[in-house]
Amino acid sequence: MTKKVKKRIYKNRSNIITLTERHVISESHVFFDECDRLSLKAKNLYNATLYVQRQSFFNPDVKFVNYYDVTKQVQMLVDKSFKSYFALLKKKSKGEYDKPVKLPRYLDKTKGRFVVPYPKDAISLKTAGFVKLSKTDISIPTRIDKDLIVGVRIVPKGNHYIIEVLYDVVKPTIEVDYSRVAFVDPGLNNLMTVTSNVFNPILYNGKPVKSINQLANKNASKRQGLRSPWKPNTKTKNKDRVQQVIFPRLESDKSKLTRSIWSKRSNRINDYFHKVTTNLMNHLVLHDIKTVVMGHNVGQKQDINLGNFTNQNFVNIPFTKLISMLEYKCQLAGINFVVSEESYTSLCSFVDKEDICKHKEYFGNRVERGLFRTSLGVLINADVNGSLNIGRKYLESIGEYSNELHNQLLNYMVNPKKLTISI
């Protein structure tokens, strides 16, 4: 690709998707101390810039600073956070946002850390296969073509850092076609229920994610329940040392263990999500799927009330992350990806073509765990019924649903296959 053609394509950012290559920097890594030092300085710069912006907000005489002409990326992030704050205020005034809106807050003076962004002109790519951050000793191996790299970020993650190499990829042209479709319903026991008009349903097992969550919750609760054998009123010769040195040290160790638990949990869930979505993408490409419709209700994790045990699992599963993974993989494969609202899709009967909305009485009902009975007494998988209704609801809303497509979906709604991807 010539520079002239490349410049013309990159001018339109809608053709571009930015991806990351991640490198984990643990506490034992040779670059950990330097990453920590840089992140601490970024935090100080963030707080200093935030102070100026907050003063301009409270005091009309102080000029509001716009950092778009400043090359310092950290200061631009502060400016971005304030613009987001004002945008949310505007939405709230129109009734489009119902959650509290607060000013950006200062980061903790000692424990606080902040992202360190390096634009392309602040990194060196002279050594083939390596990215070096300017004025540091940090040099990271990379498989990315140096012409595609647009920057690097050092991201604090509690007990470790992630160095992200950012690179741009040109998205293939996506043609909207509803002749070969797939519908995805996210859930708990079945992480994703996938239906289509060209292949039989696939149920991706969600129990590995539940077990990861339960183990993390169990271990974290144990750590929170730990109590020191020393008590503040204990009569001892070294009482001052116990209160001033040993107590804080024990609390610090407990916090490190807790951060380690949640960090490991997050990494394991990310790994499983990537494996599941990659497996699904291979299946979609194999069957030449043109459009994927995935169900999701905005705020569903915050508004549900399914009991303590279910909430512990459901609320902690990052479905938004699962959706974003599948979305960018579909974009790279040239598949049209749509996220659709899914209310009442599990209550209405797909076989009976029941209108997907609230009814006093429904044509079908769930008779036992995992099964849905239609008005004709036919038993089908409940998640398959919900998945098919997600696609039907969206396609009907845009006028692309036909009797021919409905009959195709009926032919392929039987014999669902359950898949468990190894962790």
Regions found by a protein language model. Give the residues of each.
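Nucleic-acid substrate recognition interfaces
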Residues: 1-423
